[in-house]
Each structure stands twice: as structure tokens, then as C-alpha cells.
């Protein structure tokens, strides 16, 4: 491989054959021009366009181009001026020099590793990468930047204590070479992500001697030779866990990315289990139920698996075999109509889990198909491969449909071709439907992020934001190239879509929730501006784990969402038509069953005008249902709580919930970040028997420990709730909960640009249980711009209903075009939102 390659790879890119003769001539002229006269405001557009074409050609021939190179095309589309032109001109020249090196066989050397794994998540290991000098020596002043991928949560890197964990060492076979450590402030995906959030990184500078051809350098991560315990592995599995490495050959400060060494990380010992089945089946129909053993971080477990009993409505219906397979697929059938609840337990009773509810119906009009329209792998700023992404969606998450929606600003032509081919290869008609698509990636002021899906898998190419950089140009070019019936565009709320414009032929849905948070305000913004859109949720997972995405950072901080599509059959056209018709609903990851109609018209549709509206809904939950809220034109029309206990005794169960608003304070801004709730709660005047966190899945930002009557905890909310269930005994008349919260600053990627992140002062409050009225009490804990952030205590029953139907008649102030939708919240903090039903009026055209 030209440039730098893995040691054992054969040549895949040739300077003689991967571009045409004419383009080669133009490239050589570009190299000479840059060498003779730096790029400037007057030349940047022409040079950037040729450079971008060069980069894509190199990528199509199999070359790795690094993370940032594809983005250079925007300089041709929107040529910068002033200071921006100076900065971006330097970037153009830097990449010209870099790709001149990549075209030179062996110029960037050869990278290898003797042991790629597999390594168990969270374990302490020593890993190494060895770089061998190629055709270009490393001059004095050159060196290596030992980068960290922002999403790879390895343990700490350090160079101060050889006997400590995470010690990074460098050694070379060149006896004359001397390295010194320096601190490099790194931004981008291999640093602090944003330039304003650059993070200190380790670099080694060659301060004496040169590295000549034939010599090598070895970087050891978690060096154990002087007593160190090693480097802690990340908490998530991957077939391509990155330890990015960059080289500076000449001391210029221009770091050249080397190929990612594909270290393999696998899940740990089985501590949990989950079952996946269809949501709707007919009586006697044979269906598949997948039983998946998982570790504490929701990875597929490794090692020895116990046998599991599968229970439906608390009766054992099947038992899996013990062994080393983490996933077992069973064939089952159910005779009786109605809802059925699935649970799983190991035969020794030490591991317990649940599955999704299954509704048995005769001749169902629609079935429910689950998917994830928004996920990433390592082809932009994420981790993993498209094959890992597709296998996880199909085998682990048991999705019906999925889209690998890579950011176009980091996506080169070679990676798009890999994604296109893999999407076609994994297509299994009638069983697993991957939709080809990408994420149009622009800041909110230019239109915000939008996922674009194609109905069919063909030779389509993205309408990239690098060439079509405002939302109106995306819509226009999609209409120019494709049939609007075969396109679905979905704006999302993190880097939010511009709700002032929405193309009704292309954009039937909006994404209301992802691992970034819950954003019901986003739905309200679109609907209140007259756009006829349904709702969907997705993961926005960046680790090749769509559909069953566990949180692991301070921004991708909650479980990934799911989109439910109502369709008659599991086929490409039926599911796509369901999205186009807005027959969808959104969940925060639990596979609840929702039904909703107004005067017999199903969700996502428009009913004939009537002054009397009979609104009916049904929820079949994965657990007890906490509340249902019905909205009319975004205002609460009706709400019901289902867990409240209004006859307290000496033993009580409480659900303590923290809640915060995620609505942008200023219109057009980014959503408010995560509010962190950290501190202690103490139960007074009663005995705390158990305290159970309801949604504490993030190993980075959440923690929980009970010590007698005191609980230490840390959690966070962003448009949702995070709850702790408390069981008390010997509750006295003066019983209370003392809540002491620490100072905390809001977090999250893409922070607001109008409003600064707020730091919320430490506070203490006393919650007297005698003040609970009708089973519920709310105390506001405001932040200046958000007066309704609160903590709510519910006195709750043990258990609760999982299947609830409701019917409401509305005759108040009817108007043409009124719309209705509902939200359901469970005791475990799971949420689902229906798509609206409109009454009368007419849709936007």
C-alpha cells in the first residue's frame, strides 16, 4: 500500500493507475503550485476542488485518507475569506503535501502489531504498535502523536509513573535516536472533538538523531515491564478498537495519520440476559425469540454461558443449552390472543432479564417493525466497521430495519462504496432490511443535521453537505436526482433541524430522541409550524451498535432509541411506505406496543373534520406504566397517573424522579445540555430497606451506592426522568428524605451557542413524606432559565398495570387541523411517543 500500510498488506493504491492520465497531470501541477506559492484566498476554491477529487480517488482505490481529509471539499463550495481563508489555505497545502507522501510508496512507513486480541472489556492489558521506517526517514524534530479517540474509553494514558496504570512508553531500534515527551493540545475526533475543547495528548519528539530506513519505533500502551498494571480496556466491544497514531516526519508540526490497527475487544462474563421477539403475531404462528446473554455493559457476553429458562406469562416454555454461545434463537408459537410478557432467568436463578411484550392478534392490519435509522461506525468519527454495524443490528439487536447513516463531512468516496456494497450484501428480503443512507451534516444555522434514506439500494451517491451546504439546496438536489417517493429525510434534534422549513414530499418524520437526550420540544416546533410530520427515535450510536445501544460518555449519555413502523409485512417497500405515511412511533429503547386513533383514524393520518373527537389508545408496556399524557395541539388535554398509592402505611414504596427541560432557551439554538444530579439522599424517620436505580446504565457518568439509610448517587437528565425506587419500613409521621446535591455544570456535545452552559449551585432540600398529596409531590429545583426542573416523589403501589387502554372524547373548541398525540412513561423511566392524528384541515404541500 502506498503511503503507510499495515505490515502484511499488499499494494492497493498505485500512483500510476488509480487516477486518469489527465488527472495525474493536474495533481502534479497542484503539487508544484503549492510548493512554489502557498494557497491563498484567490486560489483556494480551485485547489480545494482538485484536492478533494484526488482524496476521493485515492480512497476509491483502497487507501486510507484519515478523518478530516474529506471535509476539504467545503472550501471549494464555500470559499472562505479573510482570516478563515488564511487558516483553510494552510489546511489545503498541508493535505497536498500529505497526499504527495501517500502517493509515494512507503513514505509514511509501515504500522503493525503482534497481538490484536481479543481483549475482554474493562481488563488490564499491555498493547503495542510498531512503526517501521519506509522510504522517508524521520528527521530531528519529528515525532509521534499518541492520540486517543474521543469515544474509546480506555483508561488514563500517562508517562510519569512506569509502575502505574496506563503507562505509555516509546522505544526504537535506532541507537542514536532520543525522544522526549511533549504535550500536544488535540482537537477533533482524536482529541477533544471541538477546537474550543482541545485536550492534552501525549507526543514524543525526536530531539537527537534520525530514524533511518530499516529502523522501527514501538509504542507500548499500558507497559507492564516496570511493574505497571497495564491499560484498562474500554467498556464496549469492537472489531476495530482504535488507538490512533500520527507521525511527523520532518518537525513541521504536520501530523500524518497512520492506518488504524484493528484491536479486538470482546464482552465480559454473562451477568444479564435479554430476549427479543416480534411485537405482533397471529395465533399459532411460529416465530423466532432470541435470547442474548450480556455483560454489565450490554455487550454480547463471552466465556461460559449458563442455561436459561424462557418464561411467557410466568410459565416456562423453553430452556437454552449451557455452553459458549451467547445468542440462542428459539422457535415458539402462542395460541391465545392478547398480550404476552416474556422473561428469562438462568437455571440457577442468578441472572434475570426480560423481553419485549408480544401481542397475539387474529388478522392484524399492521405489524410493528423495529429499527434504527441513525447510527455510525468508524467511517466518520465513530468506531467499528460497517460489517460489525450490520451484524449487530441483525443478530444482537434483532432489528427489522436499519440505516448506517455516516456523517458526510467525514465520508470519503471509498467509504461510501463500502457502505453501499455492505448494505446490499446484508439485505435479506422478508427478514432484515438495511436502508442505504447517510447523515447530511451542517450546523443548525445552515439547516441542522438530517438523515437521508433511500428506498432501494442502487448506485446512488450522497447529496453531500460539502457540496450542497444549506438545507434548501439539499431538498432541491434530492428532487433533481431522485423520485421523492423513494426518499425519506429525518431531521434530528441534536444539532437540530431548522423547523421553519420542511419539505412535505421528502420529510415525513422527525427524530424526537436519541442517546443525546429526549427532545419533545422538537416535535412541538415542527407541528406548531404546520408541518405534517410523524415521530421516530434512533440511537445515534457511534460504536457500531445500532438498536440496542448502551450509553458510555457524557454526551451520548442514555440508551439509544428505536423507531416503530406499522406495516402489513416485513418488506422493504412496506416499511418504507410506513415511514412515508407516518405510521410510526418513537421509544427510548423499550419495545412498547402502542395503538392510537381519533375517530377510527390511525396515527400519522388525517381524519375528516368532526366537532366531536373520540380518542382511543392502548399501551402494552415492558413494565408497569407510570403515566399517560394526551396532547391536543401540543397542550395537555388529559393525563393519568397509574402507580399512585394514596393509603400509606408503615411500609411504603417511593419513586423519586429527577426531571429537567431540554428545550433551547433561545429559538434556533442547540438544545440545553444534560443536567447532572449528584450527591446524597438520606432517609429520616424510617428504615430504607432497598434503593434501586431505574435507568442507571452509563458507566461514565452514573453511579449508585446504598449504605444503610444513605444513598450516594450520580445521574443526569435531558428532557426525561431519572428515578430511584425506595422501599421503606417503619415509616413514622415525621419521615422525610434529605437531598443534598452537589454543584454541577451542564454537559453535552454541540453546546448552545446563544446561551452558555450553566453551572448549577449546590443545594439541599427536605422532602417531608407527610406533604405528599394524592400520592405525588413535586419540588421545583430551578436553574435560572429553566424554572420547572424538579424532583418528584410518587408513593407507588408494588407492581402496576402493563396493559392500559383509554378513551377520551373531546368537543372543546374544535378547529380544522387540530392534532392529537400521546406520551407514555413507565416506572423504569422508558418513554414512548405516538405520531399525531390530525382532524380536518389540509396538509402542507
What spans do the regions from the language model cover?
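Bacterial signal peptide processing site
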Residues: 5-7
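Beta-strand/beta-sandwich contexts
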Residues: 134, 277-280, 297-298
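Extended, charged catalytic domains and RNA/DNA-binding interfaces, predominantly
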Residues: 282-845
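Outer-membrane beta-barrel proteins
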Residues: 117-119, 209, 233, 279, ...
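C-terminal segment of classical bacterial N-terminal signal peptides
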Residues: 1-3
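Ser/Thr/Pro/Gly-rich, low-complexity intrinsically disordered stalk/linker tracts of secreted
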Residues: 14-272
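Short, compositionally biased P/S/T/A/G/V-rich stretches that sit at domain boundaries
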Residues: 67, 71-118, 273-280, 575-609, ...
Amino acid at each position: 500500500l502506498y503511503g503507510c500500510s499495515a505490515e502484511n498488506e499488499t499494494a492497493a493504491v498505485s500512483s500510476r493507475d488509480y487516477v486518469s492520465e489527465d488527472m495525474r497531470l493536474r495533481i502534479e501541477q497542484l503539487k508544484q503550485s503549492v510548493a512554489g506559492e502557498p494557497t491563498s484566498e484567490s486560489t483556494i476554491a480551485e485547489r480545494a476542488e482538485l484536492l478533494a477529487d484526488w482524496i476521493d480517488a485515492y480512497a476509491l482505490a483502497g487507501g486510507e485518507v484519515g478523518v478530516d481529509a474529506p471535509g476539504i471539499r467545503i472550501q471549494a463550495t464555500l470559499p472562505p475569506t479573510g482570516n478563515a481563508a488564511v487558516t483553510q489555505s494552510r489546511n489545503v497545502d498541508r493535505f497536498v503535501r500529505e497526499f504527495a507522501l501517500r502517493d509515494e510508496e512507503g513514505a509514511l512507513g509501515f504500522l503493525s502489531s503482534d497481538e490484536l486480541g481479543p481483549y475482554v472489556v474493562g481488563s488490564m492489558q499491555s498493547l503495542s504498535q510498531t512503526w517501521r521506517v519506509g522510504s522517508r526517514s524521520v528527521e530531528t524534530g519529528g515525532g509521534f502523536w499518541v492520540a486517543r479517540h474521543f469515544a474509546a474509553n480506555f483508561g488514563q494514558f500517562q508517562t510519569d509513573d512506569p509502575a502505574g496504570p496506563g503507562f505509555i512508553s516509546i522505544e526504537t531500534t535506532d541507537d542514536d535516536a532520543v525522544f522526549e515527551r511533549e504535550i500536544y493540545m488535540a482537537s477533533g475526533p482524536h482529541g477533544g472533538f471541538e477546537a474550543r475543547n482541545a485536550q492534552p495528548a501525549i507526543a514524543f519528539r525526536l530531539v537527537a538523531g534520525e530514524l533511518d530506513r530499516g529502523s522501527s519505533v514501538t509504542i507500548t500502551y499500558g507497559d507492564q515491564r516496570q511493574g505497571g498494571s497495564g491499560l484498562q480496556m474500554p467498556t464496549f466491544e469492537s472489531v476495530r478498537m482504535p488507538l490512533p497514531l500520527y507521525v511527523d516526519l520532518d518537525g513541521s508540526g504536520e501530523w500524518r495519520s497512520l492506518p488504524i490497527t484493528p484491536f479486538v475487544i470482546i464482552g465480559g462474563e454473562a451477568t444479564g440476559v435479554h430476549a427479543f421477539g416480534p411485537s405482533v403475531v397471529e395465533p399459532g404462528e411460529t416465530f423466532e425469540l432470541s435470547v442474548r446473554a450480556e455483560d454489565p455493559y450490554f455487550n454480547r457476553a463471552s466465556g461460559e454461558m449458563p442455561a436459561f429458562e424462557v418464561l411467557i406469562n410466568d410459565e416456562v416454555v423453553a430452556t437454552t443449552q449451557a455452553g459458549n454461545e451467547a445468542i440462542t434463537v428459539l422457535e415458539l408459537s402462542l395460541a391465545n390472543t392478547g398480550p404476552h410478557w416474556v422473561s428469562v432467568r438462568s437455571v440457577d436463578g442468578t441472572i434475570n432479564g426480560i423481553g419485549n411484550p408480544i401481542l397475539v392478534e387474529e388478522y392484524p392490519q399492521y405489524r410493528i417493525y423495529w429499527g434504527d435509522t441513525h447510527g455510525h461506525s468508524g467511517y466518520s468519527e465513530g468506531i467499528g466497521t460497517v460489517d460489525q454495524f450490520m451484524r449487530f443490528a441483525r443478530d444482537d439487536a434483532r432489528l427489522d430495519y436499519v440505516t448506517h447513516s455516516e456523517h458526510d463531512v467525514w465520508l470519503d468516496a471509498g467509504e461510501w462504496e463500502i457502505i453501499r456494497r455492505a448494505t446490499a450484501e446484508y439485505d435479506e428480503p422478508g427478514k432484515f432490511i438495511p436502508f442505504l443512507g447517510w447523515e447530511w451534516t451542517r450546523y443548525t444555522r445552515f439547516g441542522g443535521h438530517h438523515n437521508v434514506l433511500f428506498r432501494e439500494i442502487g448506485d446512488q451517491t450522497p447529496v453531500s453537505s460539502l457540496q450542497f451546504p444549506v438545507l434548501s439546496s439539499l431538498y432541491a438536489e434530492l428532487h433533481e436526482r431522485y423520485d421523492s417517493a423513494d426518499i425519506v429525510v429525518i431531521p434530528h434534534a441534536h444539532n437540530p433541524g431548522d423547523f421553519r422549513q420542511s419539505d412535505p414530499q421528502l420529510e415525513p418524520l422527525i427524530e424526537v430522541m436519541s442517546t443525546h437526550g429526549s427532545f419533545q420540544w422538537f416535535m412541538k416546533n415542527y407541528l406548531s409550524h404546520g408541518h405534517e410530520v410523524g415521530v421516530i427515535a434512533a440511537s445515534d450510536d457511534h460504536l457500531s451498535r445500532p438498536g440496542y445501544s448502551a450509553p458510555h460518555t457524557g454526551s451520548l449519555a442514555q440508551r439509544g432509541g428505536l423507531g416503530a413502523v406499522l406495516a402489513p409485512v416485513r418488506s422493504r417497500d412496506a416499511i418504507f411506505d410506513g415511514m412515508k405515511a407516518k405510521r410510526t412511533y418513537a421509544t427510548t429503547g423499550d419495545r412498547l406496543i402502542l395503538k392510537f386513533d381519533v375517530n377510527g383514524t390511525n396515527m400519522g393520518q388525517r381524519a375528516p373534520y368532526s366537532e366531536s373527537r373520540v380518542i382511543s389508545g392502548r399501551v402494552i408496556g415492558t413494565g408497569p406504566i407510570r403515566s399517560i399524557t394526551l396532547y391536543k395541539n401540543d397542550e395537555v388535554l388529559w393525563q393519568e397517573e397509574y402507580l399512585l398509592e394514596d393509603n400509606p402505611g408503615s411500609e411504603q414504596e417511593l419513586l423519586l424522579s429527577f426531571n429537567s427541560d431540554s428545550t433551547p432557551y433561545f429559538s434556533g439554538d442547540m438544545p440545553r445540555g444534560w443536567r447532572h444530579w449528584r450527591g446524597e439522599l438520606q432517609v429520616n424517620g424510617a428504615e430504607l430497606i432497598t434503593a434501586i436505580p431505574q435507568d442507571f446504565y452509563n458507566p461514565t457518568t452514573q453511579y449508585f451506592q446504598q449504605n444503610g439509610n444513605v444513598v450516594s448517587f450520580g445521574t443526569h437528565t435531558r428532557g426525561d426522568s431519572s428515578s430511584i425506587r425506595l422501599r421503606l419500613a417503619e415509616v413514622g409521621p415525621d419521615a422525610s428524605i434529605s437531598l443534598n446535591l452537589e454543584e454541577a455544570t451542564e454537559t453535552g456535545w454541540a453546546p448552545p451557542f446563544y446561551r452558555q452552559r450553566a453551572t448549577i449551585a449546590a443545594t439541599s432540600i427536605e422532602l417531608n413524606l407527610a406533604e405528599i398529596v394524592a400520592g405525588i409531590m413535586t419540588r421545583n429545583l430551578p436553574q435560572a432559565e429553566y424554572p420547572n426542573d424538579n424532583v418528584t416523589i410518587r408513593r407507588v403501589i408494588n407492581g402496576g398495570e402493563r396493559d392500559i387502554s383509554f378513551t377520551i372524547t373531546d368537543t372543546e373548541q374544535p378547529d380544522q387541523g387540530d392534532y392529537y398525540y400521546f406520551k407514555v412513561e413507565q416506572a423504569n423511566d422508558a418513554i414512548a411517543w405516538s405520531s399525531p392524528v390530525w382532524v380536518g384541515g389540509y396538509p402542507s404541500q
